Amino acid sequence: MKTKTGRILTVALIFQLLAFSACAAWLVYDAKVDRSGWAEKGGVRYYRDFHAKPVTGWLDIDGQRYFFLEGGIPATGWLEQDGVTRYFGSDGVMLTGWQTIGGKTYCFGDDGGMLTGWQQLDGIPCYLPDGILATGWQEIDGKRYYFGDDGKMRTGFTNIGGDIYYLDEGGQPLTGDAFIGENRYHFSDEGVMHTGWLTSEDGLRYYQADGTMVTAWQEIGGKRYYFGENGAAATGWYQEGEYIYYFLSDGSAAVGPTEIDGATHYFTPKGMEVILVNAAHPIPDYYTADPVIVEDWHRVDRRCYEPLMQMLSDCADAGIEYIFNCGYRTLQEQTDILEKRTREHMEEFDLDFDEARKMALETVAVPGTSEHQMGLAVDIVGEEANAWLGEHCWEYGFILRYTEEKAEITGITNEPWHFRYVGREISMDMKDSGLCLEEYLGAV
């Protein structure tokens, strides 16, 4: 019995030894196997090291950076460490560069740290005051900037809510008067570009729809204005070349009959003053002729001398003879003509003085109401000359003053020899209009 029992114990011992040996062999083999990688336990994803232990802290995996919490669980969402704020995706990957999180844009450095303050986006400045990409108006260090919906700082002309601003190279809106290129603009204290009329210290200014300040002659709302180099609209009397203008308090050029200091002045539709002289409009006291000799003893006002000489020269070159019958007359000379004509009618028609004077006034103007006293009217006699001048006088700044068609308006019978100087711009306009001077100046 002892022998049998001993054999059984021996066999059992051998099996135990073999089992222990196999287990030891297995343990030695397992210690050499890399058990690192992703694993899941209880529905929770974690990462284990070589020995299958959960890792903690920073770890780079396949070129991506992670931070593992206790238990090897990767951090997700926002994480602040040592004053540095980072963001990890739902897969635990640390984000870098520009990222949109919860509908807001952030920028993270290469170390994952959230960036703040001034940064560059596609080479254009942007601003992240608290890490979030700023848009719209922002005040930074006491200065205003505007960032588009894409977060990029705007420069140049920019439409913001229907208003136009100009943001300089530094992104700040211009205010007040400013030159941009060769053009002048005006911006409000808030930076809004001004258009239309603006009252300034030196007068009225006008800015077009594109914001540029106008200068020189402009037609605005059917009225003419003149703006100086500084943009201020002219007011009062203004002379340019041979023409004189008068600008009203609103800056517009006077047109038609206009009362100025108790006297009526007449202006063309373009604002040039033309002195209207007829039986109802004597030569104004302020007018002074500047007579110069033109042919023999005849004289004309200096203002029409050169165009008159050119007109007569061209008439002669056309092979047409003419007689220069009359130019400038003094008040006394006009008085003498009227007196002489009255006496002639008294003798020729056996009339009393009143009857003869009335008859004389049909062809002779009352002293002070003759255009000849201005020195701007000439009488050129000759049928061919009258025909040529009637066709070409407009080109030299003269008008055929009295025609048969307009006799009821002018009060003077047809005088094909009488030409009045008004300047070429006016004469050509009148030719196209077909109006006599009274009609053209709105005096009827």
Spans of model-derived segments:
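Extracellular adhesion/carbohydrate-binding repeat motifs centered on closely spaced tryptophans
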Residues: 5-273, 306, 391
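Extracytoplasmic cell-surface/polysaccharide-interacting catalytic and binding patches
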Residues: 17, 261-262, 268-444
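N-terminal secretory signal peptides that target proteins for export/translocation
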Residues: 1-2
